Amino acid sequence: MDILNTVETFDATTHRMAETYTDTPDPERNRIVRRWHVEPIPLAELKAARKAVATAKRYEVETGGILMAGTVIRTDRESQGLINGAYGLARDMLAGGVPAAPIDFKGADGWAEIPPSVMVDIGRAVGLHVQACFRAERQLHEAIDAAEDAAAVLGVDIAAGWPG
């Protein structure tokens, strides 16, 4: 005897196919009609999934670079580390703890000699950019956590509020 699997149409953002079903014999066609049940996705799972999307968006924006005075500044994790090191060195140079000299730096557009004062500006801009990304992610996570139902969770605009 054949089994005809069916499932009612549902919104996959808020519901999913359950692991349960109802079988109805259809002897005229020598088959069983299996109707799979649909269940709402638990609110905690919806929230976790939306927060994961917000986190992925934060990483995308955080590491996507910034534009500063017409120059692209890389903000991937490796570049953040290199910029942070050069920023610390530039601050030491400006404070007189290290002899002042242009900082050799390889950026998105190639090699550059960056004056210490400009390197400090770049370091601050990158740091502020990264902080703004984490602030936006935190605000989204808090809004998702505060949502009382699926519609409110899905109503949180993950594309809004990012620096850039």
Language-model region placement:
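A preference for well-ordered globular domain cores
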Residues: 1-164
